[in-house]
Amino acid sequence: MTRIEQKDNSKKGRFIYYEEDKKVGEMTYVWVDDYKIIIDHTEVDPAYGGKGYGKELVLKAVDFARKQDIKIIPLCPFAKKVFDKDLGIQDVKF
């Protein structure tokens, strides 16, 4: 069983990907202001690479942005690549 948890302290946050109870990936972000976040890092344990976990983390941030009516600046190269390839998420890109 997999799950993604979010932690946010209003200045920065993270989405953490768990497989069973083991942390296998993480995406971090910082708040620019009340309307924008910057995704600054995405990382997945190499043993779990190629399963799409990194993309799932970015898409979880997209869902969060839509619910909060905010925009995302994908500074992290991986997140930028996900945004560049997926036209369906451009609505939240700043």
Residue ranges and their predicted role:
Residues M1-R14:
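Active-site rim helix/loop that mediates acceptor-substrate recognition in acyltransferases
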Residues R14-V24:
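Conserved beta-hairpin
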Residues E20, M27-K36:
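A conserved beta-strand-loop-helix scaffold within acyl/acetyltransferase catalytic domains
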Residues K36-P46:
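Conserved acetyl-CoA binding element of GNAT-fold acetyltransferases
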Residues Y48, G52-L57:
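Conserved acetyl-CoA pyrophosphate-binding loop and the N-cap/start of the following alpha-helix
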Residues K60-F94:
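C-terminal structural segments of small proteins and small subunits
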